[in-house]
Amino acid sequence: MADEIAKAQVARPGGDTIFGKIIRKEIPAKIIFEDDRCLAFHDISPQAPTHFLVIPKKHISQISVAEDDNESLLGHLMIVGKKCAADLGLNKGYRMVVNEGSDGGQSVYHVHLHVLGGRQMHWPPG
């Protein structure tokens, strides 16, 4: 976890990201779901027995810069996350998280929804 915090503290918005490369299929990912608006794939550094990301294909660097016309797309990410969680057997519950900015732990500046499950989640989370 400390490694992710360190990455978040030095990450900055702008430019291409690893998620752009995954969307363009330039680098591999364990894809769970894909449609014309988003992509869901397993996290390469899972923080729970099941941990996947749902990302929009349209680049939006942060929730804080999302526009009103992104509302449907951002809602779609949550619906896809719910469906993928069900497909992966997370029937006892799961957590959805969006990290915003360096203090929020955002290490990749392309909006992404974390879905974590397969164990009891604790509160507070961080």
UniProtKB/Swiss-Prot annotation:
The main enzyme category here is hydrolase
Please name the GO terms that the record assigns under molecular function.
Answer: adenosine 5'-monophosphoramidase activity; deSUMOylase activity; hydrolase activity; nucleotide binding
Q: Which residues carry this modification: N-acetylalanine?
A: A2
Catalytic residues?
A: H112 (tele-amp-histidine intermediate)
Q: Per the annotation, which location comes first and is thus the protein's main one?
A: cytoplasm
InterPro entries per record: Histidine_triad_CS, Histidine_triad_HIT, HIT-like, HIT-like_sf
Give a yes or no for keyword Heme in this entry.
Answer: no
Residues where Phosphoserine is found: S45, S72
Q: Which reaction does it catalyse?
A: adenosine 5'-phosphoramidate + H2O = AMP + NH4(+)
Q: Which GO terms describe its biological process?
A: intrinsic apoptotic signaling pathway by p53 class mediator; protein desumoylation; proteolysis; purine ribonucleotide catabolic process; regulation of DNA-templated transcription
Q: Write down the superkingdom of origin.
A: Eukaryota
Q: Where is coiled-coil annotated?
A: none
Family recorded in the similarity comment? Belongs to the HINT family.
Q: How does it assemble?
A: Homodimer. Interacts with CDK7. Interacts with RUVBL1 and RUVBL2 and is associated with the LEF1/TCF1-CTNNB1 complex and with a KAT5 histone acetyltransferase complex. Identified in a complex with MITF and CTNNB1. Interacts with CDC34 and RBX1, and is part of a SCF (SKP2-CUL1-F-box protein) E3 ubiquitin-protein ligase complex. Interacts with SUMO1, SUMO2 and RGS17. Interacts with the Ten-1 ICD form of TENM1. Interacts with CALM1; interaction increases in the presence of calcium ions.
Q: What is this protein called?
A: Adenosine 5'-monophosphoramidase HINT1
Q: Which organism is it from?
A: Pongo abelii (Sumatran orangutan)
